Amino acid sequence: MSENGLPRGPSAPTLVQTLRWLVAPIELMESCRRRYGDAFSLTFLGFGSPMVLLSDPEVLRELYSGRPAAAGARNGAASGEHTLPPGRTVSLLPIMGAGSLLLLEGAEHLERRRLMLPPFHGERLRAYETAIREIAVAEVDRWRGGESFAVHERMRAITLEAILRVVFGVTDEGRLTRLRELVPQLMADTSSLSLSFRVLLAQRLGRVSPLEHLGGLREEIDLLLFAEIAERRALGVERDDVLSLLLAARFEDGSAIGDRELRDHLVTLLLAGHETTATALAWTFELLLRNRGALETLLASLEEGDDSYLRAVISESLRLRPVVPLAGRRLGRDLDAGGLHLPAGTDVTPAIWLTHTRPDLYPAPYEFRPERFLDSTPPPFAWIPFGGGVRRCLGAAFAELEMRIVIETVLSRVELSGASRGEERIARRNVTFAPRHGVRVRVLRRRADSRGRAASAIGPTA
């Protein structure tokens, strides 16, 4: 333990640690694990106090089992619930809005989560399969033999279209066209390394909003979303998309979700939903194209109409390349587990990458082995790409369904090869770990028997 009673960590100045995290996060975490073990502290600009990174599943079990907020308690910390570290809100609030589920706390967060959960689970998901498949087929059918491109960009196009048409239910072509133009611009601006430096500098200087320069983009997107909300309220037609279901949802007191809060939820789904799934898809193709044995096994299983290996491929890809590596919390009560004692008020985060690469949990942890997930499941809290507890990713089931459909559609219609030598390096993009060069691929040929096969291997929705 260090002098402040927290797990030890690097003694380098906060600025140096922050720069190392921004530029080489994997190397930083790996070196700290080798030196300090399963729990260590890092200091980041903008967070004020050290952040303790945790990778022991026993400790994560205790962290994720945080008690629900007391009824009526808006501030989760007042009831012993773990809350968000203040530093996290600085970069998210100006874009997501105060009503974003990512930023709400306590009973307010739980109430909103209960309202938003049903559209992303169970039978509701089945209504989205055909539309997602049509979007994927339309994109892949534009690919030509001999063409080379960064697959990450093509996956972004698919997942953005799925959010706009399947989740939002936008049908106005002018609105769709403008959102297709604006959202990638906003994502590029909020994901750049230079923006990270500007945000940290703004925090250091005490500026209220470090993202004013994005205001124009945000305002134009807001106008389009408010127009969609107003139009849908006026029509009052029952539909299966998520926006329609949220418009019809009611709180316990019978009131509806207001326009501003709806906007915040939609922007959160838009920015958090499509980019993370696109990144996960890009990583999956990168891993498959570097591991031809796994690719051939997957193709053979899909030919037989069996999607069990596809599900295993996705699970292994999310293990080896978790898209969101950290999910910070401020402890609302003491945490005692795995021989570790952390007092209430400590900022902590699961180090998902480190948990997923523990050799005691995953033999040969840096190798891509989908077979790990065929006949067994990892121990509790050893596989956490979607987080856990009351803040587990709301759209996890939707994302996995979308990944299954897109991967099967691509592999059934084209044959790909990697267009880059060696392993794609991990780059930090805002809160995600993305492929540094976008995963360059080449279309070797189109498959002659591709039409009609895209739905054949996708099993029942979980």
Name these PLM-found stretches:
Residues 1-98, 104, 111, 130-138, ...:
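N-terminal membrane-proximal hinge/A-helix region immediately C-terminal to the signal-anchor transmembrane segment
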Residues 1-6, 72-93, 108-110, 124-279:
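Cytochrome P450 heme-thiolate monooxygenase catalytic core
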Residues 6, 33-34, 136, 184-185, ...:
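Cytochrome P450 proximal C-terminal region
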Residues 18-37, 223, 227, 304-338, ...:
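Conserved cytochrome P450 K-helix E-x-x-R motif and the immediately C-terminal K′/meander segment
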Residues 68, 350-376:
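Conserved cytochrome P450 K-helix/beta-meander segment immediately N-terminal to the heme-binding cysteine loop
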Residues 236-240, 297-307, 320-340, 355, ...:
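Cytochrome P450 fold signature focused on the C-terminal beta-domain
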Residues 276-301, 397-414:
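Cytochrome P450 catalytic-core helices
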